Structures are given as C-alpha cells and as structure tokens.
Amino acid sequence: MSFPKVLNFKISNRRIGLKYKPLIIVELGINHNGKFSIAKQIIDKAKMAGAEIIKHQTHLPDFEMSEEAKKIIPAHTKDNIFKIISDCSLSESDEIKLKQYIQKKK
C-alpha cells in the first residue's frame, strides 16, 4: 500500500509523517479543574512524558453556552454542564500566564 505524499508535512520545524517518530499531543481539557497550579503540573508531567504539543481550549461559559446548558446534568455528576464548565475554566489572567508558561517550556 502506498500513501500519498500529503501525509508528510511540518508543524513549525517538526516533521510529521510515516518515517518520523510519532508526535505526542496532550489534551489539557478541563482536567485542571480551573486551577492554574494543576494546569502547570499537567504541562510539566506531559513534557516529562515526551509531549511536544499541548492542546488547550479557553472556555467562556457565559458566551458559549445557552440557558439550556443549565438544565443538562451529565450522568456522572449532580451538577449541570454550565456549572461544570464554569468551575473548570481558568480566569483570563491565568489563561495568559498559562500560554506564557507553555511557551517557556519549548
């Protein structure tokens, strides 16, 4: 089986393709529970484990969720999804500090 050349590309200076080592991308998600110190720990551990990219989303619950989200309660919790995302969101200043922290880790 032959693969098209499009499978070989670069992200910054990192080559991606079948003949290169796998690229490890870590999803930070909301695993930090809205705590900057935990986000930093996850980043540090990810870097130690070989991660080259951290994927992170900024959540703005008041802007990205409707009132309906306050009625949705996932099976594994007693809180609604709006509260969960609100509790697990970083502040704007922490988002900026987190970006700077990640950039220093390069």
Predicted regions and their residues:
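Active-site glycine- and acidic-residue-rich loops that bind
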Residues: N31-S37
